[in-house]
Amino acid sequence: MIYFRIRVEVHIKTKMTEDSLKLFIQSIAEIPADIAIIQLNQYLGKLTEENRKIHRINIKTLVNKFPISWCKKDENKYLAPTFKKGAYIDYLTSIANGYKIFQNPDYSPRFQLSQIPDFDENWVRITVEDFKEVVMNRNTNGKDMYNLSYDKLKTVVDSVANFVVSKYNEILEGEGDLCDEWCSSNIHTAFKGGNPDDIKRFRPISVLPILVRIMDCILASKLHAILIQYNIIDTRVQKAILRNSSGLWENIFDVNFKMCKMMDAEDTSKIFFFIDLANAFGNVNYGTMLYILEAHNFSPKFAAYFRRYYTNICGFYRNRKFKWNNGLFQGSALSLILFIIYIDFILKHMFRDMKLSGAVQLEYDLQENTYAFVDDIVMILDNDEKNEARMEVINRTFEVYGMKVNSEKTYFMMYDQTIQSIQYSNRMEYNRAGNDFLYLGQHLFVYENDIFSNIMENMLRCLEKIDRLTLSHGIKIYVYYSKIFLRITRVIEIHYIIRGNHVNIQQIIQMITHYLTKWNIPEAFMKKHLEYLGQKGGAKIAKSPNLRKYMPELNIPESIIDDKALEYEDIFGQSTPEYESVDENLQYLMKNEREEFYSDFYSSI
């Protein structure tokens, strides 16, 4: 396995062209790591000082030649797949073609929505303003498979907008097949962690042609507005669709709040199930998705576009083309919205069947006790003899829609700590969530001591590294804010609200205060550091329709405002005198030839 340090660019003093260098890197990727490293060192050793032409090749951009992705191991490095590209294409194709396409799903009994709004089908019509808004608000510099970039498009947006928008609307009005160029996508691999030799640990990420991506974003935005306006998605359950509040924050808080209450009260009557769906996006069935879109009566034009587009998509992985017959794009705004609609429909079906089958009492509020954020699902159920029947309904319902619950990654939590696993008669076995389990990227707060010990150890190392830099205080504060504060603030906010103060929180605050006052943050402000965090978290609860019910229990006043929290953000999030934009701030270290520190700093967080 060949590893490359995170965010380190390859600086090669050579006359090799960029394409030649890509081919060289590709060639060493196909051989064992020890031999590849020897060859790379030998090659670099032959370079002479006379070759002054510098090629700055960012490893992460070598997409088709040498796909690499984020590795969540302790060393935090980019990881290159060792398997041949043909093997990965075979894997993607097997996923895509492994499920029957249900032209008209045979539900038994068939599930139907209780309410279907009457939409104006012209909501899908795209305007010039829609097009310009998407183009001008994108800051990415990368080029698509046809060598088009947003930067280039911005320079000609006024002259091409009318033409492009007219073609978009022609596509939506049309009935014929879409061309291959429109339905093509480059596929990158993103390592999900775990065993790097397991081909399933590399997630396929789609990079659409830019003009397709723009239409994709416009339709996603319009569809999102429809979902919110007509309350189509059950936002008590699915939080990924929320606006003006953080659904991620809400779910992390709510699940941990109820779990901590269960543990504190020694309540043995409840059990939490963290449900993992195997290859969730890849198992969305096109026929079923089309049925759901038609059941919602969104728009015949939109449903027709879905059919014409998704039934013709093909991917390019390392310049080899393949086609699949199931699965939504990961990396597509529209696919994300469609997936949320798909999961919402499944959960509504599941809730009905759980009550009709008697697995759950009719009065049990499944909406109140189910939390979804895209495909991350938590269900709080009664811990009794009907657990097996409930899990059977859950598994069966997902299977109807072409999905599968991954029992190896579905965990539970209950008060009785002597129970480490549960096995049912259908051979499904579920393990207890441990202190290394992550829900939405966050450790469970019942393991608070482990959480704070890890934070303190890593934070001290990072603060010391920032302090050693010969940079202005403003830059140091910004690096702290963007790369440390934003990673720990949610933990402290939520823990402070649920548990109150904690000795380790005080130690963390003292550690931060020592360095930030050294970097000219007012000491008087730092003394209220924790108060601001608590107020900020309280304001989030007060603003959330789903969490507002907890305000009396948590002693959060109705009059709470977050002006102080905003002041807090302003102090740490302000632009530095040297640079105005976020990107320029974060690139400061690179521009000052501190690549080695930059890499080491990132790898330690």
Map each language-model feature to its residues.
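Surface-exposed loop/turn segments and immediately adjacent short secondary-structure elements
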Residues: 15-19, 23-200, 210, 214, ...
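Catalytic palm active-site di-aspartate
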Residues: 144, 184-187, 203, 237-242, ...
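Basic, alpha-helical interaction scaffolds
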Residues: 427-498
